[in-house]
């Protein structure tokens, strides 16, 4: 019985530092990007659409001021889209971006809140790009 107890103790002593090391290496989410307001009152930013990710993935904007986003896809084959939908209907943006292309969109958020940004493209029967992690958020203050 002591043999099994000793093995369990040794195993635990090895597992704790290993799991602590793994937790320390976990990627941290990028900090929010506060979109600056230009002299003309427009909030402008560029968002990179890559393989199943947006960068930046968390945008912070001001309510009532126009937002101009330049969406640049850096993928060579896979098309993406950029969707923001408020279930209450105060904000609805949906823009396709072909592989390797750049598109500029403009919208004015009127309601403060946090809204999901996502790509719903998918190749049947595979999971959607959102399911693979291509999502972010728009925070309107």
PLM regions and their residue ranges:
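N-terminal edge beta-strand
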Residues: 35-66
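Extracellular/periplasmic metallocenter environments
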Residues: 27-34, 97-141
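Extracytoplasmic entry segments of secretory-pathway proteins
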Residues: 1-46
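Short beta-strand/loop motifs in extracellular/secreted proteins, especially
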Residues: 67, 78-82, 113
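Histidine- and aromatic-enriched segments that form or immediately flank copper-ligand environments
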Residues: 72-99, 125-134
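Non-cytosolic beta-sheet module surface loops
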Residues: 49-51, 71-75, 109
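Intrinsic-disorder/low-complexity, polar/charged segments enriched in Ser/Thr/Lys/Arg/Asp/Glu/Gln
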Residues: 42-46, 64-68, 102-104, 114, ...
């Amino acid at each position: 019985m002591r043999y099994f107890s000793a093995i369990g103790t040794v195993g635990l002593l090895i597992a704790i530092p290993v799991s602590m090391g793994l937790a320390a290496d976990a990627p941290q989410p990028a900090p929010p990007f506060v979109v600056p307001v230009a002299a003309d009152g427009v909030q402008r930013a560029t968002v990179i659409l890559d393989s199943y990710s947006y960068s930046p993935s968390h945008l912070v904007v001001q309510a009532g001021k126009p937002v101009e986003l330049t969406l640049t896809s850096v993928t060579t084959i896979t098309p993406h889209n950029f969707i923001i939908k408020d279930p209450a209907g105060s904000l609805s943006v949906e823009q396709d971006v072909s592989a390797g292309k750049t598109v500029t969109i403009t919208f004015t958020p009127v309601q403060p809140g946090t809204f999901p940004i996502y790509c719903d493209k998918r190749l049947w029967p595979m999971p959607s790009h959102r399911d693979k992690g291509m999502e972010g958020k728009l925070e309107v203050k």
